[in-house]
Amino acid sequence: MKHGIYYAYWEQEWEADYKYYIEKVAKLGFDILEIAASPLPFYSDIQINELKACAHGNGITLTVGHGPSAEQNLSSPDPDIRKNAKAFYTDLLKRLYKLDVHLIGGALYSYWPIDYTKTIDKKGDWERSVESVREVAKVAEACGVDFCLEVLNRFENYLINTAQEGVDFVKQVDHNNVKVMLDTFHMNIEEDSIGGAIRTAGSYLGHLHTGECNRKVPGRGRIPWVEIGEALADIGYNGSVVMEPFVRMGGTVGSNIKVWRDISNGADEKMLDREAQAALDFSRYVLECHKHS
């Protein structure tokens, strides 16, 4: 497995100096830095090349996370919005190719956060989304990018809430580079068994986010990590595992993620670094010690 962390653990906005965090996570011992997609459409080719060179120079693989806006909603009943969303992803995927990024994950099939004041049409949105994702998947394949669809809890989305729904959706899209993405935070809310959910995803699992039920780093709460490690071993998972802790209030990140108290207990950057490094050591051990010989 390759282990990573989402840059926003340290940040309060959905953009940052990614080169700074590449160098940081390399020193902490990570393999992967996950960055946000939102600023990438505004990068020049020079900026893209500089970021790619920084990642390569530090031995860091970049993955990308994205919470699509309502204007990027591939499931929208408005054909103009779906057309705009397809154009957005086409441009973004070409940029990921230039950046040498091979994985994007998130609520790519819908938008985030959901406006629940509007009427929900799960069946219609599902059908439109499957058709749209199938079309975008062709571009992703040409760009060498896995398109990973994140299973989210009911408070953040309504289309795909369980691993089984994720597998059903991916099977309907029927494209090799469209995969299921699971997250321990969301599974803790929706699944009867986290290990069972991972086994349900099986070979369709393309990306895994980790974190505690209160968004702390792995190992600081009650998520059943041994069970998760055993399930990953059972399905032979050897892909990316990216921790996605959110522990700081403030900014767009704190508002979107609903962090209303300082979960970090006043930690400064160095303390956050130490927590991340300890969580990395914990994750490497508990998630990989069950591998079948």
Swiss-Prot record:
InterPro entries: IolE/XylAMocC-like (IPR050312), Xyl_isomerase-like_sf (IPR036237), Xyl_isomerase-like_TIM-brl (IPR013022). The active site is at E150 (proton donor/acceptor), E244 (proton donor/acceptor). The keyword Metal-binding applies. Its cofactor is Mn(2+); Co(2+). It holds the Pfam family AP_endonuc_2. The keyword Transcription regulation does not apply. Its EC number is 5.1.3.30. Optimum temperature is 55 degrees Celsius. One of its GO terms (molecular function) is cobalt ion binding. SUPFAM superfamilies: Xylose isomerase-like. It catalyses: D-allulose = keto-D-fructose. Substrate binds at Y6, A107, E156, D183, T184, F185, H186, R215. Transmembrane segments: none annotated. Disulfide bonds: none annotated. Keywords: Cobalt, Isomerase, Manganese, Metal-binding. Mn(2+) binds at E150, D183, H209, E244. Binds 1 Mn(2+) or Co(2+) ion per subunit. Can also use Mg(2+), Fe(2+) and Ni(2+) ions to a lesser extent. Homotetramer. Involved in the biosynthesis of D-psicose. Catalyzes the reversible epimerization of D-fructose at the C3 position to yield D-psicose. The enzyme is highly specific for D-psicose and shows very low activity with D-tagatose. Belongs to the hyi family. This is D-psicose 3-epimerase. It comes from Ruminiclostridium cellulolyticum (strain ATCC 35319 / DSM 5812 / JCM 6584 / H10) (Clostridium cellulolyticum).
